[in-house]
């Protein structure tokens, strides 16, 4: 399903009123689903109502890495309110992608997140940027992540802009 990633519209999603207008415009131009990300602070129930009122659905979200690590139960509960079964991490701390040790730490933590989300009927993906194309031991950091994630259910959001920017 093709939808609008709302990060691009983040200037217009910082209040519930602005979000309602942005969602109405997204629906008006022909989309049926969104990826929720970078919204201003507002109750998830209000966001869910605004989405439903426009006839849209939330197909996916981006959740900050610190929240996934420390507030995963809340993240799951919020996704239930949004009727959304998929989240991705939009950005990880730089020490994660600057070394293979950082990758190994990420994988260890991501396995726990994948398992808990999976037990709740949800899936999880990694959204990359250009810096994951740095090479370590002859392969890009992202290729190393692909290789080690074969034995657990980590998805990947391939961003064509960042693929080109990363030189792949």
Question: Which residues are covered by each model-predicted region?
Answer:
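Acidic/histidine-rich catalytic cores of soluble enzymes
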Residues: 34, 118-168
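N-terminal pre-domain/capping segments
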Residues: 1-86, 155
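Glycine/Thr-rich phosphate-binding loops of Rossmann-like dinucleotide-binding domains
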Residues: 44, 97, 134
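Active-site beta-loop-alpha junctions enriched in small/polar residues
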Residues: 5-9, 37-39, 63-66, 92-94, ...
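Histidine/acidic residue-rich metal-binding segments in metalloenzymes
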Residues: 109-115, 147-148
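Helix C-cap/helix->beta junction micro-motif
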Residues: 53-54, 82, 113, 119-120, ...
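Charged helix-capping and loop-helix junction motifs
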Residues: 17-21, 72-73, 102-111, 138-143, ...
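Glycine/small-residue-rich loop that forms an oxyanion/phosphate-binding "nest" at active or ligand-binding sites
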Residues: 70-105, 109-110
């Amino acid at each position: 399903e093709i939808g609008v990633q709302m990060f691009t519209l983040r200037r217009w999603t910082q209040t519930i009123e602005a979000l309602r207008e942005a969602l109405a415009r997204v629906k008006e131009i022909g989309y049926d689903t969104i990826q929720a990300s970078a919204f201003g602070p507002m109750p998830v129930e209000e966001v869910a109502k605004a989405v439903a009122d426009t006839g849209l659905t939330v197909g996916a979200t981006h959740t900050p890495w610190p929240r996934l690590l420390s507030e995963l139960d809340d993240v799951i509960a919020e996704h239930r309110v949004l009727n959304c079964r998929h989240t991705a991490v939009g950005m990880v701390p730089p020490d994660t992608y600057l070394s293979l040790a950082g990758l190994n730490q990420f994988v260890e933590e991501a396995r726990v997140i994948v398992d808990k989300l999976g037990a709740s009927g949800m899936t999880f993906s990694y959204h990359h940027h250009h810096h994951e194309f740095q090479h370590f031991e002859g392969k890009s950091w992202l290729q190393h992540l692909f290789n080690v994630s074969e034995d657990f259910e980590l998805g990947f959001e391939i961003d064509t802009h960042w693929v080109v920017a990363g030189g792949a």
